[in-house]
């Protein structure tokens, strides 16, 4: 068991509330709690009592003792449920510090749970994901990962992979056998099965990252093309000021919405043009910077002299900014104000025709946005995933393809080597093999009381 010193932190959000919870974990948790309460605490019993600093009553509330290893961290844990006043909670924290505890680092309770094998790394990350989920679907997906569904799938895959690798290595270790193990159909079928499972997990992880992190959309275009109207139409409310005056939006305007349960971070930017206005020029600089950070760019135009606008044509529309826009960025051309046209062109490829002011074509645009990122609404098979999970799975997928190539070539040693590499990438997801730097980066993103 992982045992160090004893840590303490407030486990509930900042601010006033009906209840505030203080969590203590470590080898001296019970001793400290009994000093604070002047009570003998029984495991898994809720004890109503006063909380003291020396002999001075700070508050009264409910105290619960969880004896190791039957606790969140796997250590002795005490939770004090007091009144949710920050001043009172901080007084209790100070009293605990005086008794020998120290303030917990961000994510340290969950880190201790991981180190004590109460959960694996993917489950630990799911704790943060379920706290930060910004949609119902994201919360449900995070809950599945927290329950271990994602880890079970990875572990089942690892079991098959390890068995196959052992079988392949046996064929290398016993070359005197007359049987050519590499021609055994069992190896071919097992490798193909593993390949298909990794591919399925790869697709599921991609969906999971979208749910966990959302999609960042940037609205760009010339002034008065209708970017702010489009932001309001997508958000379903008046988030940005809309006027007929070009250059109204001078700074970044952000809105967070959901499309079919997928979090969307929409950013409206200043219209791209040369301007002598210092404030507007600064807004335009920020717009260019945001374009480089986007998952998708919605280029809004009301110029119908060229309804087949392509990326190269942006040089004609905004020539002064053409060189500053990444050439490989995913751009959708949103042709606005179609209510002013006698005949409306059909949507095609990356060209969507709308009227933001009259809410025409907005649903088609939303559908297009989801299709562009490859999101499919298959909730049952989606787990909340991190970018590092996707990277690990993508790498595993590339090496399982190389393993198939080596099998076809009859290279047993290289096949075994590729299978080992795949195993290492999969192990990194659940934390079977993880560097201290990676663990520090993951747990530092948690809130203090978790």
Curated annotation (Swiss-Prot):
GO molecular function (one): GTPase activity
UniProt keyword list: Cytoplasm, GTP-binding, Hydrolase, Magnesium, Metal-binding, Nucleotide-binding, Potassium, tRNA processing
GO CC field: cytosol
SUPFAM superfamilies, A to Z: P-loop containing nucleoside triphosphate hydrolases, TrmE connector domain
Cofactor note: Binds 1 potassium ion per subunit.
Positions of (6S)-5-formyl-5,6,7,8-tetrahydrofolate binding: 23, 79, 118, 450
Similarity annotation: Belongs to the TRAFAC class TrmE-Era-EngA-EngB-Septin-like GTPase superfamily. TrmE GTPase family.
Protein name according to UniProt: tRNA modification GTPase MnmE
Organism: Francisella tularensis subsp. holarctica (strain OSU18)
């Amino acid at each position: 068991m992982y045992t160090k010193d004893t840590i303490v932190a407030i486990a509930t959000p900042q601010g006033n509330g009906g209840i505030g919870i203080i969590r203590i974990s470590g080898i001296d948790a019970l001793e400290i709690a009994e000093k604070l309460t002047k009570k003998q605490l029984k495991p898994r019993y809720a004890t109503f009592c006063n909380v003291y600093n020396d002999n001075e009553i700070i508050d009264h509330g409910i105290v619960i003792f969880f004896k190791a290893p039957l606790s969140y961290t796997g250590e002795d844990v005490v939770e004090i449920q007091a009144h949710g006043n920050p001043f009172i909670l901080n007084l209790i924290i100070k009293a605990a510090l005086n008794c020998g505890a120290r303030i917990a680092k961000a994510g340290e309770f969950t880190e201790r749970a991981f180190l004590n094998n109460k959960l694996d790394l993917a489950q630990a990350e799911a704790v943060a994901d379920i706290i930060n989920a910004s949609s119902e679907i994201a919360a449900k997906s995070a809950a599945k990962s927290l329950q271990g569904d994602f880890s079970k799938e990875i572990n089942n895959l690892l079991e098959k992979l390890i068995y196959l690798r052992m079988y392949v290595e046996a064929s290398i270790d016993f070359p005197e056998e007359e049987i050519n193990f590499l021609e055994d159909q069992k190896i071919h079928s097992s490798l193909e099965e593993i390949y298909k499972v990794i591919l399925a997990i790869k697709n599921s992880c991609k969906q999971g990252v979208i749910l966990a992190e959302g999609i960042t959309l940037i609205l760009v275009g010339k002034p008065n093309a209708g970017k702010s109207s489009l932001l309001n139409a997508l958000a379903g409310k008046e988030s940005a000021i809309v006027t007929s005056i070009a250059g109204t939006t001078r700074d970044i305007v952000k809105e967070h919405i959901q499309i079919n349960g997928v979090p969307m971070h929409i950013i409206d930017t200043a219209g791209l043009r040369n301007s002598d206005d210092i404030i507007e020029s600064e807004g335009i600089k920020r717009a260019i910077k945001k374009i480089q950070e986007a998952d998708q760019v919605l280029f809004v135009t009301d110029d119908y002299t060229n309804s087949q606008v392509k990326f190269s044509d942006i040089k004609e529309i905004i020539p002064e900014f053409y060189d500053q826009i990444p050439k490989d960025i995913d751009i959708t051309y949103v042709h606005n104000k179609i209510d002013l046209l006698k005949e409306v062109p059909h949507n095609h490829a990356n060209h969507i025709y709308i009227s933001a002011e009259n809410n025409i074509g907005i649903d088609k645009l939303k559908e297009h946005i989801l299709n562009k990122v490859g999101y499919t609404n298959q909730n049952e098979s989606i787990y909340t995933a991190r970018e590092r999970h996707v990277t690990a799975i993508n790498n595993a997928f590339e090496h399982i393809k190389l393993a198939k190539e080596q099998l076809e070539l009859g290279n047993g040693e290289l096949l075994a080597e590729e299978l080992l590499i795949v195993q290492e990438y999969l192990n990194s997801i659940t934390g079977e093999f993880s560097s201290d730097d990676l663990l520090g980066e993951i747990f530092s993103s948690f809130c203090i009381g978790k």
